[in-house]
Amino acid sequence: TGFIGVKLAGPPIVCFKEGTMIDIMDNNSKQETQVKVEDIRKGMYVKTYQHGFLPVKHVAFKTIENPETNDRIEKRLYICDQAKYPTLKEPLIMTGCHSILIDESEYTDIQKKMIREQNGMLFKTDDKFRLPVMYDDKAAPYCVKGEYKVWHICLEHFDQEMNYGIYANGLLVESCSERNICLAEYDHV
């Protein structure tokens, strides 16, 4: 399937390409709306899968170099399109370790094996399982070579290793944990 096995040498890069739209609560109207990930600031409220709207604790970014090859590796961008992900409002581009949240029945045996080799186990966010986009056959490597600014957000949580399900361009994905956002050498806003 073109997968290259990886062992992470540090915290994973779990980010959205600049321009990704995140579901939030508008501070003035108190209505749900979308805002570009790079425009999110600490204290804004992001829509979660099971916990309503929660405040942002950290906003961070970094620049990554994206190759033009089709290699399925962690440190690159992948694109998810509407034809394969019906809830998407527009294509979603994110880094290889960023997870889409799925039901356990959606995993393939190969995906389970690859994730266990990388992480030691399958991880959950709420009642959904995490599928790193680099292991999702429906996602394709984003083969536009260049430097890209990628962003992520961490929401308030009493446990710094936990995250939430959030909506990016309409797709249910993971937010970043406080631990990972602080260890991953991001620039904080």
State each model region's role:
Residues 12-32, 45-188:
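Long beta-strand-rich cores associated with HINT superfamily self-processing modules
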Residues 1-2, 189:
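Accessible peptide chain termini
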Residues 38-45:
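Structural motif
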Residues 2-13:
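A recurrent domain-boundary module in secreted/ectodomain proteins
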